[in-house]
């Protein structure tokens, strides 16, 4: 979850305006539990007309949220992003300790039918004014949640234990090349050489692609990978 300066938006056009001026008299960071997204990833099977995402306001005051989907380019404002999804509602007010469902519906598209496509769901939580802030100049910070959205064409298997059979590891110089022969995006949290973790960061490999990985050591007789399945579980196996 990232904290960003809140930028007010036009509810009619849902257009983001400029950043608040930094020339302010005070900056207030109120305690606010905020809105959370249930789950760590969204799988959208092509045969589904829509999928529902559950949000929860864990704060003790109501919050205003703005939700949108992007294709990985975070430089564009929401109103300029073009993705083949309709999200309802894009703006909503959630009461304290209350939930809200957001519906994602696929639109006519030209997405690949032989492999998954990746997008991202963003939820911007705009905190309310506290009684202490009323009438004061304050910089409010909005909290943004962003999780992966995988669009899965018909006939493509889920990410599970069988996915390991589609992963190949080869030495390359001082590093490794991991080949993903599956039609899924695969997220690898751990690469272990002789049961010692050697990767520096989480790796995400596109379907039917290979990726070079920097590791602390590639001198091993066997490799164990830990991947994240459809449900956000960490599963490991020997490669």
Swiss-Prot record:
Disruption phenotype: Deletion of the operon under classical laboratory conditions does not result in any major effect on E.coli capacity to form biofilms compared with the wild-type strain. It is found in: Periplasm. It holds the Pfam family PapD_C. GO terms for molecular function: protein folding chaperone. One of its GO terms (cellular component) is outer membrane-bounded periplasmic space. SUPFAM superfamilies: PapD-like, Periplasmic chaperone C-domain. Induction: Expression is negatively regulated by H-NS and subjected to cAMP receptor protein (CRP)-mediated catabolite repression. InterPro entries: Ig-like_fold (IPR013783), PapD-like_sf (IPR008962), Periplasmic_pilus_chap (IPR050643), Pili_assmbl_chap_C_dom_sf (IPR036316), Pili_assmbl_chaperone_bac (IPR001829), Pili_assmbl_chaperone_C (IPR016148), Pili_assmbl_chaperone_CS (IPR018046), Pili_assmbl_chaperone_N (IPR016147). Residues 1-31 form the signal peptide. PROSITE patterns: PILI_CHAPERONE (PS00635). The keyword Chaperone applies. Its main location: periplasm. GO terms for biological process: cell wall organization; chaperone-mediated protein folding. Coiled coil: none annotated. It comes from the Bacteria. Keywords: Chaperone, Fimbrium biogenesis, Immunoglobulin domain, Periplasm, Signal. Belongs to the periplasmic pilus chaperone family. Part of the yehABCD fimbrial operon. Could contribute to adhesion to various surfaces in specific environmental niches. The operon is cryptic under classical laboratory conditions, but is functional when constitutively expressed. This is Probable fimbrial chaperone YehC.
């Amino acid at each position: 979850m990232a904290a960003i300066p809140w930028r007010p938006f036009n509810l009619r056009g849902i257009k983001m305006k400029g950043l608040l001026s930094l020339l302010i008299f005070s900056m207030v960071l109120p305690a606010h539990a905020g809105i959370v997204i249930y789950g760590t990833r969204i799988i959208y099977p092509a045969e589904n007309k829509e999928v529902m995402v559950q949000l929860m306001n864990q704060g003790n005051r109501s919050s205003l949220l703005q939700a949108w989907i992007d294709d990985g380019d975070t430089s564009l404002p929401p109103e300029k992003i073009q993705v083949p999804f309709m999200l309802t509602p894009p703006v909503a007010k959630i009461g304290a300790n209350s939930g809200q469902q957001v519906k994602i519906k696929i639109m006519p598209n030209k997405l690949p039918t032989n492999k998954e496509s990746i997008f991202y769901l963003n939820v911007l939580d705009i905190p309310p004014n506290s009684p202490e802030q009323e009438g004061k100049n304050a910089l409010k910070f909005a909290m943004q949640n962003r999780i992966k959205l995988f669009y899965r064409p018909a006939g493509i298997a889920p990410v599970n234990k069988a996915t390991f059979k589609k992963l190949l590891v080869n030495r390359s110089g001082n590093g490794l090349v991991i080949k993903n022969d599956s039609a899924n995006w695969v997220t690898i949290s751990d690469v272990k050489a002789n049961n010692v973790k050697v990767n520096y960061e989480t790796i995400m490999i596109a379907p039917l692609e290979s990726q070079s990985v920097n590791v602390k050591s590639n001198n091993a007789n066997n490799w164990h990978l830990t991947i994240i399945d459809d449900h956000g579980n960490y599963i490991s196996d020997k490669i």
